[in-house]
């Protein structure tokens, strides 16, 4: 496999490279810079005498970054391309931003105030996880192969159990306890892979999404095909774009149930933004717009506002989390129903993306694969009084079907 695929341009002929040594190149030089155990010196790279077994992978980083260790005792002091000894090093990618050089991890959103580039994953339950990366460039995601999974995915609810859950939510609606609940289930399968990079490569090819993201750091491995924006920040301006309403591709118009569901969440998100934005600044510039995505269509709205002075990142996450579209309305009551009926969602239905200074792009962490002891994927549907239980089950299948087909296995 070409270790530079997706980062470097086509490589020249490498007859001088000995067997078992992967080629590492400089685009500017257009020539080999590594030969087995030879001392390596170029204008951009000084690795000293590095054993060849450590020279396996290459990733681009900003020139003049100093001092990232590639293995014990060996350091780059001035480089354009960094040689790494493992393809399992922390990495983050979203919308063309490739971040490497993991230097710090934190569970405190106050860390975001330092102005550095932080990849962020929050859980539905409110846990905050962030990894700081020192090197950020514009680059495509490094392509990695994926061997498709075999076997059958297990679901936290089978069809009859999920339908019973939907009916229970409808009872809560009838009692006036909630107006809407996003009822979810988790599917999982045993898998033995080092990471999900190869799966994310397939996602980018087979299910491109506006907020697709890959985040790998200690304790985190998430491959996302999220279609939904949780929060975009540019200075004082913030925007959220909740999705409520899903239908098969080719659907021309959504019914009243989907439209009512969307408007409920728009109202909820207006209230959430109102807690951190200046009075009178919250607006809805787009309402009930149809967006086309691979295999389905969504109903989307935009809510915008201007942040109050001195608003911190900790306040933003506290006031807005979890996202309204994947909890329900009223949010506190919906969360109570979810906790009573579902297991822990974890990274699914949290927030996922990056923060740097007063800028951010955070997606709603839906359509994500995440890995711990198993490979997991969440899917759900918004339940209102007008919900037809069998239709809601089919919606969860629709959301999972295309992506699971990329990963492999039987849904």
Walk through the language-model features, giving the residues of each:
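N-terminal, intrinsically disordered charge-dense segments
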Residues: 1-20, 25, 32, 62-79
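Extracellular interaction modules
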Residues: 45-55, 126
